Amino acid sequence: TWPEASEFCRAQGKRLPREAEWEKAARGDSGHLFPWGQQTPTPELAKFGQYLVHEIPIVAPVERGEADSSPYRLHHMAGNAAEWVEDWFGIDYYATMPDRNPRGPNSGRYKVVRGGSWKSEPVMLRTATRSGASPDRRAATIGFRCARSLH
């Protein structure tokens, strides 16, 4: 759940990244369509589109490769597990937020989830694609990464 992810990060002296931080970390300054560049996702670049019908999904480590890294050398920013971020979901986020240090709404019904998961279609792996989920949702498709401020 979002509260569990947030608490885990806080216990480590960190926090969930803000949505704008997550996107910049994924796309870099050059505006990549996907974390690794403009190339359409392939199984070598991301774990995605894996629908299981009569099997139970098993969580397992995913090997880190150089091909899937973002411009800031972060791995698995697309596919594998989608990721909770700090912000509440605002449908008009891109239209209403300032260009510098944007923040999501102060409250809402859903928290933002970024990056797509092992179950996602390729379009969900784009660096600008965003979705929302109820903060109390627990799913095998949603994980998180912690961030820390540099100053």
Residue ranges and their predicted role:
Residues 1-131:
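Functional-site microenvironments in short loops/helix caps that host divalent-cation chemistry
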Residues 139-151:
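Short, structured beta-strand segments at or near domain termini in extracellular proteins/domains
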